[in-house]
Amino acid sequence: MFAVIKTGGKQYRVAANDVITIEKLEGVAGDKIEFTEILMVGVGADATIGAPFVEGAVVSAEVVDQGRAKKVIAFKKRRRQNSKRSRGHRQHQTIVRILDIAAAGGKAKKASKKTEAAAEAAN
C-alpha cells in the first residue's frame, strides 16, 4: 500500500517503513506525527485519487531525527571591482519513518513481509 502525502509544499510517495527527509516539523526523535493531507492512496495498480485530498485517509509516522541539509553557497563576484560576497545556507530538515497508512474509513495497514521483500528487490 502506498500514499502520496503533501508536506512542506512538496509531495512524497510513501509506503510503510519508508524513511524520508522532509522540511522541518516540530518534534523530537521518537515523537509520533500524522499527515492528513493525503493526495492519493493505492494498492498496486488500484488507487484512490483525492479532490484535492482523500477524505479520512491518514499516514502515521515517527520522527527519527532533526538535522540540517548540506550547505548551499551563494557567491557573488563583481569583476574588476575587487568585490565579492559569500554566504551559506543550511535548510532545517526532519527525518521521519512511515509507520502505517490508513485508507479512508479503513483500518491501518502495515506492509507485509512479501511486499517489504519486493520493495527491497526493486531498490
UniProtKB/Swiss-Prot annotation:
Subunit structure: Part of the 50S ribosomal subunit. Contacts protein L20.
One family name in Pfam for this protein: Ribosomal_L21p
Lineage: Bacteria, Pseudomonadati, Pseudomonadota, Alphaproteobacteria, Hyphomicrobiales
Disulfide bonds: none
Keywords: Ribonucleoprotein, Ribosomal protein, RNA-binding, rRNA-binding
Keyword Secreted: no
SUPFAM superfamilies assigned to the protein according to its UniProt record, in alphabetical order: L21p-like
Superkingdom, natural source: Bacteria
Biological processes per GO annotation: translation
Species: Rhizobium meliloti (strain 1021) (Ensifer meliloti)
Name listed for the protein in its UniProt record: Large ribosomal subunit protein bL21
Family label: Belongs to the bacterial ribosomal protein bL21 family.
GO function terms (MF aspect): rRNA binding; structural constituent of ribosome
One cellular component (GO) term of this entry: ribosome
